[in-house]
């Protein structure tokens, strides 16, 4: 699984530990790619700015992770849904925000 999120999420073990315990290998972006994702999140997306170049950068990072074995891309940042939609993506995507909502609705 490709894990894309803030540097805290990608460098930390919160998601990675859960996935590892379930037998899922987690692939994270290279350090320079993590810096770029962090910049996109905090300088653009959190301010409502969605640039085509940033979408392209995001998709490039996702593709790099997929080539390393991350067959599904986990959007583990609430803002990444502004860049890619799990229902229209060219590759398998799980948006953690949408997954939380689905789980809460299923619980109801």
Model-derived features: where do they sit?
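Non-catalytic structural scaffold of enzyme domains
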Residues: 2-108
């Amino acid at each position: 699984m490709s894990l894309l999120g803030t540097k805290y999420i990608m460098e930390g073990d919160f998601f990675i530990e859960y996935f590892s315990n379930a037998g899922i290998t987690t692939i994270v972006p290279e350090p320079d790619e993590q810096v770029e994702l962090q910049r996109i999140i905090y300088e653009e997306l959190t301010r409502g700015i969605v640039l085509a170049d940033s979408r392209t950068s995001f998709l490039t990072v996702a593709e790099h992770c997929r080539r390393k074995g991350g067959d599904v891309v986990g959007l583990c940042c609430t803002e990444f849904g502004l860049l890619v939609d799990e229902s229209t993506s060219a590759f398998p995507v799980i948006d953690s925000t949408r997954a939380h909502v689905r789980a809460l609705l299923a619980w109801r």
